[in-house]
Protein backbone atom coordinates (compact mmCIF):
# COMPACT_ATOMS: atom_id res chain seq x y z
CA UNK A 1 0.00 0.00 0.00
CA UNK A 2 2.86 2.33 0.86
CA UNK A 3 4.63 1.60 -2.44
CA UNK A 4 1.41 2.23 -4.40
CA UNK A 5 0.96 5.62 -2.69
CA UNK A 6 4.53 6.64 -3.52
CA UNK A 7 4.02 5.63 -7.15
CA UNK A 8 0.77 7.62 -7.35
CA UNK A 9 2.42 10.66 -5.77
CA UNK A 10 5.24 10.60 -8.32
CA UNK A 11 2.77 10.40 -11.21
CA UNK A 12 0.78 13.30 -9.77
CA UNK A 13 3.92 15.42 -9.35
CA UNK A 14 5.01 14.62 -12.91
CA UNK A 15 1.59 15.58 -14.27
CA UNK A 16 1.67 18.89 -12.38
CA UNK A 17 5.18 19.66 -13.68
CA UNK A 18 4.18 18.92 -17.29
CA UNK A 19 1.07 21.07 -16.99
CA UNK A 20 3.08 23.97 -15.57
CA UNK A 21 5.68 23.65 -18.34
CA UNK A 22 2.97 23.67 -21.01
CA UNK A 23 1.36 26.75 -19.47
CA UNK A 24 4.67 28.63 -19.45
CA UNK A 25 5.38 27.67 -23.05
CA UNK A 26 1.93 28.79 -24.11
CA UNK A 27 2.36 32.11 -22.34
CA UNK A 28 5.76 32.70 -23.92
CA UNK A 29 4.35 31.94 -27.36
CA UNK A 30 1.50 34.37 -26.77
CA UNK A 31 3.90 37.11 -25.66
CA UNK A 32 6.05 36.53 -28.75
CA UNK A 33 3.08 36.68 -31.11
CA UNK A 34 1.72 39.83 -29.46
CA UNK A 35 5.02 41.70 -29.65
CA UNK A 36 6.22 40.47 -33.05
CA UNK A 37 4.32 43.00 -35.24
CA UNK A 38 5.93 45.94 -33.42
CA UNK A 39 9.38 44.48 -32.78
CA UNK A 40 11.88 47.14 -33.91
CA UNK A 41 14.49 44.52 -34.74
CA UNK A 42 12.17 42.57 -37.05
CA UNK A 43 13.70 42.19 -40.50
CA UNK A 44 11.80 42.99 -43.67
CA UNK A 45 10.93 40.48 -46.35
CA UNK A 46 11.28 41.51 -49.99
CA UNK A 47 12.55 40.25 -53.32
CA UNK A 48 15.63 41.72 -54.98
CA UNK A 49 14.47 44.20 -57.62
CA UNK A 50 17.76 44.63 -59.48
CA UNK A 51 20.63 47.05 -59.75
CA UNK A 52 20.36 50.82 -60.10
CA UNK A 53 20.07 50.60 -63.88
CA UNK A 54 16.95 48.45 -63.48
CA UNK A 55 15.17 50.12 -60.56
CA UNK A 56 15.73 53.84 -61.16
CA UNK A 57 12.97 54.08 -63.76
CA UNK A 58 10.37 52.81 -61.26
CA UNK A 59 10.94 55.60 -58.72
CA UNK A 60 9.65 59.16 -58.39
CA UNK A 61 12.93 61.05 -58.13
CA UNK A 62 16.49 60.31 -59.23
CA UNK A 63 19.00 62.91 -58.10
CA UNK A 64 22.48 63.56 -56.82
CA UNK A 65 22.20 64.55 -53.18
CA UNK A 66 24.38 65.60 -50.26
CA UNK A 67 23.60 64.50 -46.70
CA UNK A 68 23.14 67.54 -44.45
CA UNK A 69 22.27 65.89 -41.15
CA UNK A 70 20.42 62.97 -39.64
CA UNK A 71 18.13 62.43 -36.67
CA UNK A 72 16.51 59.14 -35.73
CA UNK A 73 15.78 57.27 -38.94
CA UNK A 74 15.58 60.42 -41.07
CA UNK A 75 18.11 62.34 -43.14
CA UNK A 76 17.97 65.86 -44.52
CA UNK A 77 19.39 66.02 -48.04
CA UNK A 78 20.23 68.86 -50.37
CA UNK A 79 19.18 68.14 -53.94
CA UNK A 80 22.21 68.97 -56.08
CA UNK A 81 21.14 67.77 -59.53
CA UNK A 82 17.87 66.19 -60.63
CA UNK A 83 18.48 63.41 -63.14
CA UNK A 84 14.83 62.39 -63.48
CA UNK A 85 11.58 63.55 -61.89
CA UNK A 86 10.61 66.85 -60.24
CA UNK A 87 11.35 68.39 -56.87
CA UNK A 88 11.14 72.11 -56.17
CA UNK A 89 12.58 72.11 -52.65
CA UNK A 90 16.32 72.49 -52.25
CA UNK A 91 16.26 70.31 -49.12
CA UNK A 92 14.22 67.12 -48.75
CA UNK A 93 13.71 64.64 -45.92
CA UNK A 94 14.47 60.96 -46.38
CA UNK A 95 13.15 58.26 -44.02
CA UNK A 96 15.18 55.09 -43.61
CA UNK A 97 15.21 51.88 -41.56
CA UNK A 98 12.92 51.49 -38.54
CA UNK A 99 10.77 48.57 -37.40
CA UNK A 100 10.45 46.16 -40.33
CA UNK A 101 10.64 48.75 -43.13
CA UNK A 102 12.69 47.51 -46.08
CA UNK A 103 15.14 50.39 -46.06
CA UNK A 104 18.87 50.83 -45.37
CA UNK A 105 20.21 52.05 -42.04
CA UNK A 106 20.66 55.81 -41.68
CA UNK A 107 24.22 55.24 -40.43
CA UNK A 108 25.27 54.22 -43.94
CA UNK A 109 24.94 57.84 -45.09
CA UNK A 110 27.13 60.15 -42.96
CA UNK A 111 26.83 63.93 -43.05
CA UNK A 112 28.71 65.43 -45.98
CA UNK A 113 28.62 62.29 -48.12
CA UNK A 114 27.27 62.48 -51.67
CA UNK A 115 25.06 59.98 -53.44
CA UNK A 116 22.93 59.27 -56.46
CA UNK A 117 19.59 58.07 -55.10
CA UNK A 118 16.41 56.70 -56.66
CA UNK A 119 13.67 57.75 -54.23
CA UNK A 120 9.99 57.05 -53.70
CA UNK A 121 7.74 59.92 -52.59
CA UNK A 122 5.39 59.22 -49.67
CA UNK A 123 1.85 59.86 -50.86
CA UNK A 124 -0.30 58.08 -48.26
CA UNK A 125 -0.56 58.05 -44.48
CA UNK A 126 0.30 54.66 -42.98
CA UNK A 127 -1.66 53.58 -39.86
CA UNK A 128 0.73 53.52 -36.92
CA UNK A 129 3.46 55.07 -39.03
CA UNK A 130 3.91 58.06 -36.74
CA UNK A 131 4.31 58.00 -32.95
CA UNK A 132 4.22 61.44 -31.27
CA UNK A 133 6.31 60.02 -28.43
CA UNK A 134 9.15 59.26 -30.88
CA UNK A 135 8.75 61.86 -33.65
CA UNK A 136 12.23 61.16 -35.05
CA UNK A 137 11.46 57.46 -35.53
CA UNK A 138 8.74 57.26 -38.13
CA UNK A 139 7.51 55.76 -41.38
CA UNK A 140 7.61 59.27 -42.80
CA UNK A 141 5.35 62.15 -43.71
CA UNK A 142 3.42 62.79 -46.91
CA UNK A 143 5.68 64.64 -49.33
CA UNK A 144 8.88 63.19 -47.87
CA UNK A 145 10.84 60.33 -49.43
CA UNK A 146 11.86 56.74 -48.72
CA UNK A 147 14.80 54.68 -49.99
CA UNK A 148 14.36 50.95 -50.55
CA UNK A 149 16.96 48.34 -49.60
CA UNK A 150 15.43 45.77 -51.97
CA UNK A 151 17.66 46.75 -54.88
CA UNK A 152 20.48 49.04 -55.92
CA UNK A 153 18.56 52.23 -55.21
CA UNK A 154 21.66 54.25 -54.25
CA UNK A 155 25.17 54.78 -55.57
CA UNK A 156 28.03 56.55 -53.85
CA UNK A 157 29.27 59.65 -55.68
CA UNK A 158 32.89 60.74 -55.44
CA UNK A 159 34.89 62.97 -57.78
CA UNK A 160 32.26 62.74 -60.51
CA UNK A 161 32.14 58.93 -60.50
CA UNK A 162 29.66 56.48 -58.99
CA UNK A 163 30.08 53.08 -57.37
CA UNK A 164 27.56 50.59 -56.03
CA UNK A 165 25.13 48.00 -57.33
CA UNK A 166 24.83 49.61 -60.73
CA UNK A 167 24.20 46.84 -63.23
CA UNK A 168 24.28 43.03 -63.02
CA UNK A 169 26.11 43.00 -59.68
CA UNK A 170 25.48 40.23 -57.11
CA UNK A 171 22.15 40.44 -55.32
CA UNK A 172 22.11 42.20 -51.95
CA UNK A 173 25.67 43.44 -52.51
CA UNK A 174 25.62 47.22 -52.28
CA UNK A 175 29.39 47.70 -52.50
CA UNK A 176 30.57 45.28 -55.20
CA UNK A 177 34.04 45.45 -56.67
CA UNK A 178 33.82 47.55 -59.81
CA UNK A 179 35.42 50.33 -61.76
CA UNK A 180 33.87 53.72 -60.87
CA UNK A 181 31.59 54.94 -63.65
CA UNK A 182 31.38 58.55 -64.79
CA UNK A 183 28.28 60.35 -63.56
CA UNK A 184 27.88 61.81 -67.07
CA UNK A 185 27.56 58.29 -68.49
CA UNK A 186 24.96 57.34 -65.89
CA UNK A 187 23.03 60.54 -66.62
CA UNK A 188 23.07 59.72 -70.32
CA UNK A 189 21.68 56.26 -69.55
CA UNK A 190 18.86 57.73 -67.47
CA UNK A 191 18.02 60.07 -70.37
CA UNK A 192 17.95 57.09 -72.73
CA UNK A 193 20.98 58.22 -74.75
CA UNK A 194 23.18 55.18 -74.05
CA UNK A 195 22.24 51.56 -73.45
CA UNK A 196 22.71 49.15 -70.59
CA UNK A 197 25.71 47.54 -72.26
CA UNK A 198 27.61 50.83 -72.07
CA UNK A 199 27.21 50.86 -68.29
CA UNK A 200 28.26 47.23 -68.08
CA UNK A 201 31.38 47.83 -70.11
CA UNK A 202 32.35 50.93 -68.14
CA UNK A 203 31.92 49.20 -64.79
CA UNK A 204 33.90 46.13 -65.83
CA UNK A 205 36.95 47.87 -67.23
CA UNK A 206 40.25 46.67 -65.82
CA UNK A 207 41.80 49.68 -64.01
CA UNK A 208 45.32 48.34 -64.65
CA UNK A 209 44.64 47.98 -68.37
CA UNK A 210 43.15 51.46 -68.55
CA UNK A 211 46.21 52.89 -66.79
CA UNK A 212 48.48 51.05 -69.22
CA UNK A 213 46.56 52.49 -72.18
CA UNK A 214 46.91 56.00 -70.78
CA UNK A 215 50.63 55.52 -70.22
CA UNK A 216 51.03 54.19 -73.76
CA UNK A 217 49.19 57.17 -75.23
CA UNK A 218 51.40 59.58 -73.31
CA UNK A 219 54.51 57.71 -74.47
CA UNK A 220 53.45 57.89 -78.11
CA UNK A 221 52.80 61.62 -77.80
CA UNK A 222 56.24 62.15 -76.30
CA UNK A 223 57.90 60.15 -79.10
CA UNK A 224 56.18 62.25 -81.74
What are the residue ranges of the model-derived segments?
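Bacterial N-terminal signal peptides that target proteins for export
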Residues: 2-12
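Bacterial N-terminal signal peptides
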Residues: 12-22
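Netrin-like (NTR/C345C) domain of secreted extracellular proteins
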Residues: 26-34, 102-224
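Short boundary/loop segments of OB/S1/cold-shock single-stranded nucleic-acid-binding domains
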Residues: 36-59
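Extracellular secreted precursors and ectodomains with disulfide-bonded cysteine-rich loops/domains
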Residues: 42-44, 100, 148
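N-terminal post-signal-peptidase region of extra-cytosolic proteins
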Residues: 46-53, 94-105
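Structural detector for short beta-strands of small beta-barrel domains
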Residues: 58-77
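OB-fold (S1/OB) nucleic-acid-binding surfaces
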Residues: 73-96
Amino acid sequence: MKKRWRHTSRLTALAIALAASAALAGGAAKDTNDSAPMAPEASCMCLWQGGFADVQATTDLVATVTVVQGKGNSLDLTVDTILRGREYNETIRLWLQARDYCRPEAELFPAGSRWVMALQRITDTVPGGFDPLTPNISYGRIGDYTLSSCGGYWLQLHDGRVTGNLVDAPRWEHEPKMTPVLLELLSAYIRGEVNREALQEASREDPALRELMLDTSEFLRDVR
